[in-house]
Amino acid sequence: DGLNRLLYKCPHCGTEGNMVGKGIKLTCHNCGAEYELTETGFLKADNAIFTHVPDWYAWQRQQVREELENGTYCLDTDVDIAIQVDYKAIYKVGKGHLVHDENGFHLTGGDGKLDYSQSPTFSHTLYSDYYWYELGDIICIGNKKCLYYCFPEAKGVVAKTRLATEELYKLVTKSGLSV
């Protein structure tokens, strides 16, 4: 269960967020394409486009990079927010909104009290996790003063956001662009 969190985009129809992983099956609920994860870790399917999970993931990375280069990538979702300001606990602080685009991350919430931005060059990767402590998928941004644990309402966006963070960092630092 849960392979759909990593392999979120159907290689047959291109739909995102409609992959469902149950047991050893990974199925697109848009076009019906179905893959089976074998005991040796390979994918098996009629008309299989990918037979290896890393190849599928690399294809998704390339798709995200193309969206970034074309200016069409954007994560825009409501989130539940928890923060870590010390090493004692993580505190739930309510609802907010997270945007990730060519300008980096922008998190708002707390009835206007929270407004945090993070540039694309802040980090070459993103701390993200799936079903984190059985609470949900997370995207974590922040700095040494405060970490923001964002639980997206949109499903299947965590892996894509991580890929986008990594590819955006490469694009911005390679081109020397200032964002």
Language-model segments: residues:
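Cytosolic/stromal cytosol-facing helical appendages immediately following the last transmembrane segment
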Residues: F122-H124
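Non-catalytic C-terminal accessory region of glycerolipid acyltransferases
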Residues: D1-Q84, L98-H100, T108-G110, L126-V179
